[in-house]
Amino acid sequence: MGLIRVLANLLILQLSYAQKSSELVIGGDECNINEHRFLAIVHTDISLCTGTLINQEWVLTAAHCDGGNMDIYLGVHNESVRYDDEEGRVPAEKFFCLSSRNFTKWDKDIMLIRLNIPVRNSAHIAPLSLPSSPPSVGSVCRVMGWGTITSPNETYPDVPHCANINLFDYEVCLAAYPEFGLPATSKTLCAGILEGGKDTCVGDAGGPLICNGQFQGILSWGDDPCAQPRLPAVYTKVFDHLDWIQSIIAGNTDATCPFVNF
């Protein structure tokens, strides 16, 4: 078993820029240009991640995607073709569940970013709403990004790819990764394809898991090589963090994250 992808993501900037390092999905197809208007590229000194625009001023991503000199790009479909409505932003503020930015307890890998300037809805930019209810085990979920489409050797395309995967009971991930000592209960989601072949991968961290049209998860980590049988990925559960997200957006910067008894 290789290093988990949360670590591999931090090494992605060492790749040649000739490879077009960004975000993508193993076993997927090119996304429809109209289905990812909320998708953000999150670029820092140490990593390339993705994020999700949840209103004109706020982006959700993974805490481990934090780094210096962060740039956020919205409205991108083809990295070699610039659209008139593409937007670049930097963070005005970043908020974390833990003041120490410690995501090693797995349930706290979430970061809320306030953009320095709000974006406007356009042909290629529009937010994705927060979920109104939790997801159901067995749901078919959509993942997307510009990350590597091959693993362990990495190949980066110019356009985002999308794939459908399944939402499992959390116990499936407990059984898949016994060596990590995962907590018995968790505010994360477990998703993938048990027979392998489709998966998120290096560079997709922080990206959305969309189940039945609702934004339910933020990619946290998975196995490397990607898309192996019976080794699904782990996603921060957005629904369980709604109170924290909405409180921060409303101006309560002292809001605390939900507690899990480990």
From Swiss-Prot:
Alphabetical list of CDD domains matching this protein: Tryp_SPc
Chief place of localization: secreted
Name assigned to this protein: Inactive snake venom serine proteinase 13
Residue ranges annotated as propeptide in the record: 19-24
Record domain Peptidase S1: where: 25-250
GO molecular function: serine-type endopeptidase activity; toxin activity
GO CC, alphabetical: extracellular region; secretory granule
Claim: Signal is one of the keywords in the record: yes
Entry-listed glycosylation sites: 78, 102, 153
Taxonomic path: Eukaryota, Metazoa, Chordata, Craniata, Vertebrata
Family designation: Belongs to the peptidase S1 family. Snake venom subfamily.
Subunit structure: Monomer.
Tissue spec: Expressed by the venom gland.
A Pfam family it matches: Trypsin
